Amino acid sequence: MPPTPCSLCHTARALVKRPKTGQQVCKDCFFEVFETEVHNTIVEGEGIFKRGERVAIGASGGKDSTVLAHVLSVLNKRYDYGLDLYLLSIDEGITGYRDDSLETVKQNQAEYGLPLKILSYSELYGWTMDKIVEQVGKKNNCTFCGVFRRQALDRGAAQLGVDHIVTGHNADDIAETVLMNIMRGDIARLARCTAVTTQSEDTIKRSKPFKYAYEKEIVMYAYFKKLTYFSTECIYSPDAYRGHARVFLKDLEAVRPSAIVDIIHSGESFVLEQSVQRGMKALQTCLRCGYISSNDLCKACALLEGLESGLSRSALRQTQESTSAAPEGHRTIPMFERYASLNGTPRTPPTPAEPVEGIERAA
């Protein structure tokens, strides 16, 4: 039986069957169509980026962030986006997992020639995830990690003076999030979880260029490009709630390959009614650390106070309503500062030529 020709160039032998479309394509055409689809996501509408932006790539060393760093470096040159790219990594303090994956990030730094900033939970919160799990157990540890990681990314970006954070969240991740928000009845998050770009009044802009990129295609891209990435799953994630949504999504995909993007499009159709929006809490800044919050105390400060006090999970919720200073002797989070304040007063970020504390420059 003769080899199947590429359905795009009709000359080379097809090596890849795209999970998203069913197209059988050669390696070079796969690279081109994958990169072009990411570019189309970037430039759709008003576009994700603005020329001259300083952009931090959330780098974990995994397949998604590794491919994102590679593809953004390629597209930035090919289409002349005019971006200053950085790698920003968060060290959660998970022995045997994050310490190994950060070595992969450092290899990526050398390969792509991008400056790297690493910020740890230990230096920011005084806790590592290993210590947190010792205290709270594995059942609820993802709550702590998610809250701490999101704020750590914003704080690392502020230290770099960047305008924008991009993450490697792919189509599978976003479809899982839609399903999770439906199962939890989380209307507010359901209405915004499919957006390519999100930004609150005083948070740094975040974007997901891989919104429509299937996880399987990201893996194939990394494989055929021979990219170095860390493939071990977090040792604390098997019990995460997201895992149930992931299993359900894979079952749907097996029956209907377009299920992933279909769920994303369904999520895009959800819009909050004005009456619901008016009932939501207004955003303000945390009285302790200055980070954006819908309560007087942000989630990170509330969780940290609970850890420092040895509180149970039910008691942790009560700390979010606290307006008092942290108890004496408790560790607290440094004040959050960024380059555009809540009242609109601009603050000048460091220019690319200025050294930024804690940054590792590519050789």
UniProtKB/Swiss-Prot annotation:
Keywords: Cytoplasm, RNA-binding, Transferase, tRNA processing, tRNA-binding. GO terms for molecular function: nucleotidyltransferase activity; tRNA binding; tRNA-uridine 2-sulfurtransferase activity. One of its GO terms (biological process) is tRNA wobble uridine modification. NCBIfam families: TIGR00269 family protein. It comes from the Eukaryota. It is an enzyme of class 2 (transferase). It holds the Pfam family zn-ribbon_14. It is found in: Cytoplasm. This is Cytoplasmic tRNA 2-thiolation protein 1. Its EC number is 2.7.7.-. Its main location: cytoplasm. Residues 340-363 are annotated as: Disordered. GO terms for cellular component: cytosol; cytosolic tRNA wobble base thiouridylase complex; mitochondrion; peroxisome. It comes from Cryptococcus neoformans var. neoformans serotype D (strain B-3501A) (Filobasidiella neoformans). InterPro entries: CTU1-like_ATP-bd, CTU1_C, Ncs6/Tuc1/Ctu1, Rossmann-like_a/b/a_fold, TilS/TtcA_N, tRNA_thiolation_TtcA_Ctu1. Plays a central role in 2-thiolation of mcm(5)S(2)U at tRNA wobble positions of tRNA(Lys), tRNA(Glu) and tRNA(Gln). Directly binds tRNAs and probably acts by catalyzing adenylation of tRNAs, an intermediate required for 2-thiolation. It is unclear whether it acts as a sulfurtransferase that transfers sulfur from thiocarboxylated URM1 onto the uridine of tRNAs at wobble position. Prior mcm(5) tRNA modification by the elongator complex is required for 2-thiolation. May also be involved in protein urmylation. Pathway: tRNA modification; 5-methoxycarbonylmethyl-2-thiouridine-tRNA biosynthesis. Belongs to the TtcA family. CTU1/NCS6/ATPBD3 subfamily.
